Every structure is written in structure tokens, then in C-alpha cells.
Curated annotation (Swiss-Prot):
HAMAP family: DnaK
Protein name, as recorded: Chaperone protein DnaK
Renumbered residue ranges of the record's region Disordered: 609-642
Listed transmembrane segments: none
Keywords assigned by UniProt, alphabetized: ATP-binding, Chaperone, Nucleotide-binding, Phosphoprotein, Stress response
InterPro entries: ATPase_NBD, Chaperone_DnaK, Heat_shock_70_CS, HSP70_C_sf, HSP70_peptide-bd_sf, Hsp_70_fam
Gene that encodes the chain: dnaK
GO molecular function, one term: ATP-dependent protein folding chaperone
Species whose genome carries this gene: Francisella tularensis subsp. mediasiatica (strain FSC147)
Annotated Acidic residues bias: 628-642
Length: 642
């Protein structure tokens, strides 16, 4: 059985960890970094870039560089959040798919589902793990924000499938961080608040860590959050300030210039990071734009105090979910023994200060906020594989689940913060006399009004025998698995007839869609391999051309004019072949040059051997002088003395 890897699929950055013996280890990517930007770019040549390579070219390719895709995953195009929060903040096209989902499109018109784009990041993680382990990797534990709904969880699972990974478990990010902390902690019973402010989402979880019969039991008491609050919003606040200041100075609005916008976005992110350790920074972007009077440069000084004033409302927004999580857990601030900070944005001093003020205690800073979640995912992978024995994880469902009943009301079957896996049944009846069928409308959310909650799906239970209203007994059962994914069934108790729905398609992708995307991903992998092989063939050819010409130069007159001409001709033909994309043609011309150069190589080798022989002969003559010979005693060492 292969390793089950742990992946933190983040909005801004992603991280990979595996179990190495009894400890979890973060694995560096091919570029030598422990985190990988969650950025995917499609180039004009058809190449797919992932991570740092994609991020580097974002300024020159804003329409085809996709970042913060996690904010779109599992969402409908008409969602208020998509229309107000995302479409206005990204340079790439967000479109409405045939099924109503929010998809993205390249400038060439290629349409893609968010799980398809996220799958490229997961594929890079999978490849990194395979390169490190030297064996195929097919199974993973992937983390999601605790406040992700059913659609978003299912869409994340779909992304894994498209990337060629069987997702063994979807685990909540704060829970994963607590797992990483809890496995290392030997302090006995603790109640921990995990404050997780990442690139795109915010979660707060109240978690109890206890020793139960020698097992480390990690039980989530409550969770809350905001799926539209994260580091991207902090970047955006600073970016808008820089653009407004530039407009005041120069009278030019950069909001409509995609290239300039991307440069300012990157500069804002860099300045934000610098202001976590420095009191002020200079944002300097020469030649940001131009008008009739000539080129314009952006040069603005930003102090930490100014930045904090721009984002203070964002930090305060994170405290309301903290209050709700404490209320749901039935605890007060004084009951919290430790506060863990997770997510890169928690490095900001203002965030640390406000968290300290709220909980009344210094948050722990000994965990790496970028890596803790991936480490926890790897530990959960170890638990599932049977490699980690003494850990028991009890997670919760973040939002209430129920069905629509008479009058457009949502009747909850499973309340939020219920420990999962769980199963709950309730009996309902018909609203009219002789009603032949009932529609079960499955909802997720906290509102009383059904239409205000998230619709997960509908199905019908038909062929109900004629009866007065209120007489038929329809038993509805909700069953949530350990991934937080829901199965719903309805049964007519009189006839035993049953109908069920696995809320699979709540991600918006059918099995056929996913299968097609898996095939596309495999085709891309094949294309990537062909591209890699072509580059290898070109490099081999370039090296051979260089070494052949160098040898001809060094041998000088020892090579005949005819031989020189033959080799130069072969070099030119090979150079011409390397400018094309035909690998076989390059290899054929490489072989032709090797054959043409072989006699010269033999001649050079023979000369070297002759020179070495002459030198060796001269040295062999020397010892005829009187030599100092040193006698040495030696002793046989028998086996039993070894």
C-alpha cells in the first residue's frame, strides 16, 4: 500500500506533507520551496504553468493566469458573493456554465470548472510527492476551510479525482492544525482555539484535546467562519489605496489597465509582507503607465499605521465568528487554554494583537502557520493508513442541514456543530389529500426561510397510495460521512418504497464531466511528457554540437578539410532540426552527427592514449635511481578477531 499524502489546498499557497516514520514531514517542491503558489497559467504556446512559474508571468498574462480559484469552487455564478466579491476583483473572465456554476475562461475562450484548475495544483503536489518517494502516489487527505458547505467539499473531492488522486478524507483546516499541535503536545487535557486566517478564508474552531485510554482524542466542539475573508482582501485594500493615491497625483485611474493592475496587486502583496516586520515601506513601480506627457511612475510610501487603518475592519470582522464559536461550544474566553494561529495572514502584528485582546492570552507562535495544516493532513493520512495508532479525531458539520417543509420553512434534521459521521431520521407527511408524490428539497444553512439557505438538491418520492393529508408516513434520513458529505433518503413507511440521493452533483459536475476532465488531465500529462522529451532531445543536440566544434578546434590540422566540412554540415543540419518541434528529426540528425564525429573522436582518443603512454614510460624509467623502500610488517586478521 502506497503513502497517503496530506495536502493543504490553499487559496494563495498550497503545501504538501507526508508521514516519515512517526513524524510528518513537509516536502519541498521542484523549485526548492516548502509552499507552492495556488496559481495556474495557460500560455500562448499551450503550456500549463503551475506555482511560482505561473505567478512570475502573471503581469504579462493576466487574462490567462488563474489565482484564488478556491473562492469559486462549488459556487453558482449568480451567487451574490461571486457577483460582488470575486468578479470585480480578478482580471480573468468568470462565466456562467450551462449548469449555472461559476466557471472561468481563458482569453481564447476555453471554459474550465474551478475543480479542473485546482486539479493542476494538486497534480503538481502529487508529482512532488512521487519524486520524493520514488513511487506512485494515488491517495490523499485534502484540507478545506471548516466553513465550506457540501458543494464546496464535493468540488474539492472532484478536483482530487481529476488530478488522479483518490481523496481518502476531506478534513477541516483548523482541525488539521489542531491535529498537528495535539500530536506533538503532551500537556494533557486542553481546550484550544484555532484562529485560521489564510489567503482567502477565515475559520475559528474550538477544539478539545484529551488523553482517552492512552489515545490522543481531538474533538471539535464548534466551528465558525467567513469564506470571504483572507489575505487576498488585505492585498486588495492596499492595492485600492495605492491606485487611489496614484489617481490623486497623476489623474490616471489604473483600474482599467489589467497589466498595471497586476503589477500593483503584486507590489501590494509584497508591501503587506514587509510591513509585518518593518514600520514603513516604499512601493516603487517605474513606468506603470503613460499619457500624452510621457511615462508615469508610481512611488508611494506606506507606513504600518496606514496599512493597519486600511484593514482594521477586516481584522474586526474575524472576531464576530470567534464569539459565535465560543457560544456554540458553551464556553467563555477564560475556558480557552491555548490559542493557535494558522494561515500566513496571522503573521500581521495587528491580527496577533486583536486575537490576544479578544481571548485575553498570548497566542502561540511556535507552529509554522503556512505548514501546520498540511502536517495535520499527513497525520490524518497516517491514521487512515494505520501508521499512526494513538490518535482519534472527532470533527463536526459546520452548517445545519434540513429540508423545505410547508410554508417555505427549513426544518433542520442535523444542527450545526454536530459530531460526524452522524445519521438522523424524521417522519414527515403529505400537505394535501391523496397527494401522489412528495418532493424532498435538501437545504444547508441557518435561516428559517428555506429560500435563504443553500439548496443542495431535490428528489421525488412517488407512488404514494391515496390517503388523507397527514396520514402517509414519510421517513427522511440524513446521513453525513466523515468527509462531511451528505446522503439523503426518503421512505414511505406504508409501502416500504424508498428513494435516495447522494448529494454528489452538488459540486455541479456529473460523473461524465469529471471523467472527461480526468482524461483531459491525462492528455495534458502526455503533452507535458512530450514537451519534456523534446527539450531533452534539444539539449542533447546542443551539447553535441558544442563538443564537436570544440574538438575540431582543439585538434586543428590533425583533422582534414573534408572531415571538418562533413562535421560542420552535420552540425548545421542538427541546428536547423532543433528549431523545429519534431523530436524524431532531432534524434536522427543527432545520430548523424555522432556517426560523422566518431572517427575524429577515435583519433582524439588515440592521441590522448599515446601521450599518456609516453608520459608513463618516462616515469617508469625514473625508479632506476636508488630507491627508499619501506618494509612494513603485516598481520593476518582472523575472522573471530573482526
Amino acid at each position: 500500500m502506497g503513502k497517503i499524502i496530506g495536502i493543504d489546498l490553499g487559496t494563495t499557497n498550497s503545501c504538501l506533507a507526508i508521514m516519515d516514520g512517526k513524524t510528518a514531514k513537509v516536502i519541498e517542491n521542484a523549485e526548492g520551496h516548502r509552499t507552492t503558489p495556488s496559481v495556474v497559467a495557460y500560455t500562448d504556446s499551450g503550456e500549463i504553468l503551475v506555482g511560482q512559474a505561473a505567478k512570475r508571468q502573471a503581469v504579462t498574462n493576466p487574462d490567462n493566469t488563474f489565482f484564488a480559484i478556491k473562492r469559486l469552487i462549488g459556487r453558482k455564478y449568480d451567487d451574490k458573493a461571486v457577483q460582488e466579491d470575486i468578479k470585480k476583483k480578478v482580471p480573468y473572465a468568470v462565466i456562467k456554465a450551462d449548469n449555472g456554476d461559476a466557471w472561468v475562461a481563458t482569453k481564447e475562450g476555453k471554459k474550465m470548472a474551478p475543480p479542473q484548475v485546482s486539479a493542476e495544483v494538486l497534480r503538481k503536489m502529487k508529482k512532488t510527492a512521487e519524486d520524493y518517494l520514488g513511487e506512485p502516489v494515488t491517495e490523499a487527505v485534502i484540507t478545506v476551510p471548516a466553513y465550506f458547505n457540501d458543494s464546496q467539499r464535493q468540488a474539492t473531492k472532484d478536483a482530487g479525482k481529476i488530478a488522479g488522486l483518490e481523496v481518502k478524507r476531506i478534513i477541516n483546516e483548523p482541525t488539521a492544525a489542531a491535529l498537528a499541535y495535539g500530536v506533538d503536545s503532551k500537556k494533557g487535557e486542553q481546550t484550544v482555539a484555532v484562529y485560521d486566517l489564510g489567503g482567502g478564508t477565515f475559520d475559528i474552531s474550538i477544539i478539545e484535546i484529551a488523553d482517552v485510554d492512552g489515545d490522543n482524542q481531538i474533538e471539535v466542539l464548534s466551528t465558525n467562519g467567513d469564506t470571504f475573508l483572507g489575505g487576498e482582501d488585505f492585498d486588495l485594500a492596499l492595492m485600492n489605496y495605492l491606485i487611489d493615491e496614484f489617481k490623486k497625483e497623476q489623474g490616471i485611474d489604473l483600474h482599467n489597465d489589467k497589466l498595471a493592475l497586476q503589477r500593483v496587486r503584486e507590489a501590494a502583496e509584497k508591501a503587506k509582507v514587509e510591513l509585518s516586520s518593518a514600520q514603513q515601506t516604499d512601493v516603487n513601480l517605474p513606468y506603470i503607465t503613460a499619457d500624452a506627457t510621457g511615462p508615469k511612475h508610481l512611488n508611494i510610501k506606506v507606513t504600518r499605521a496606514k496599512f493597519e487603518s486600511l484593514v482594521s475592519d477586516l481584522v474586526m470582522r474575524s472576531l464576530e465568528p470567534c464569539k459565535k464559536a465560543l457560544e456554540d461550544a458553551g464556553l467563555s474566553k477564560s475556558d480557552i487554554t491555548e490559542v493557535l494561529l494558522v494561515g500566513g495572514q496571522t503573521r500581521m502584528p495587528l491580527v496577533q494583537e486583536k486575537v490576544k485582546e479578544f481571548f485575553g492570552k498570548e497566542p502561540r507562535k511556535d507552529m509554522n502557520p503556512d505548514e501546520a495544516v498540511a502536517v495535520g493532513a499527513a497525520i490524518q493520512g497516517g491514521v487512515l493508513a494505520g501508521d499512526v495508532k494513538d490518535v482519534l479525531l472527532l470533527d463536526v458539520t459546520p452548517l445545519s442541514l434540513g429540508i423545505e417543509t410547508m410554508g417555505g420553512v427549513m426544518t433542520k434534521l442535523i444542527e450545526r456543530n454536530t459530531t460526524i459521521p452522524t445519521k438522523k431520521s424524521q417522519v414527515f407527511s403529505t400537505a394535501e389529500d391523496n397527494q401522489p408524490a412528495v418532493t424532498i428539497h435538501v437545504l444547508q444553512g441557518e435561516r428559517e426561510m428555506a429560500s435563504a439557505n443553500k439548496s443542495l438538491g431535490r428528489f421525488d418520492l412517488a407512488d404514494i397510495p391515496p390517503a388523507p393529508r397527514g396520514m402517509p408516513q414519510i421517513e427522511v434520513t440524513f446521513d453525513i460521512d466523515a468527509n462531511g458529505i451528505l446522503n439523503v433518503s426518503a421512505k414511505d413507511k406504508a409501502t416500504g418504497k424508498e428513494q435516495n440521493i447522494v448529494i454528489k452533483s452538488s459540486s455541479g459536475l456529473s460523473e461524465e464531466d469529471i471523467e472527461k476532465m480526468v482524461q483531459d488531465a491525462e492528455a495534458n500529462a502526455e503533452a507535458d511528457k512530450k514537451f519534456h522529451d523534446l527539450v531533452t532531445a534539444r539539449n542533447t543536440a546542443d551539447n553535441l554540437i558544442h563538443s564537436s566544434r570544440k574538438a575540431i578546434q582543439e585538434l586543428g590540422e590533425k583533422v582534414t578539410a573534408a572531415e571538418k566540412e562533413k562535421i560542420e554540415e552535420a552540425c548545421k543540419e542538427l541546428e536547423a532540426a532543433t528549431k523545429g518541434d519534431d523530436k524524431q528529426a532531432i534524434e536522427a540528425k543527432t545520430k548523424a552527427l555522432e556517426e560523422a564525429f566518431a572517427p575524429i573522436a577515435q583519433k582524439a582518443y588515440a592521441e590522448q592514449a599515446q601521450a599518456a603512454g609516453a608520459q608513463g614510460g618516462a616515469k617508469a624509467e625514473e625508479p632506476k635511481k636508488e630507491e627508499d623502500v619501506v618494509d612494513a610488517d603485516f598481520e593476518d586478521v582472523e575472522d573471530d578477531k573482526k
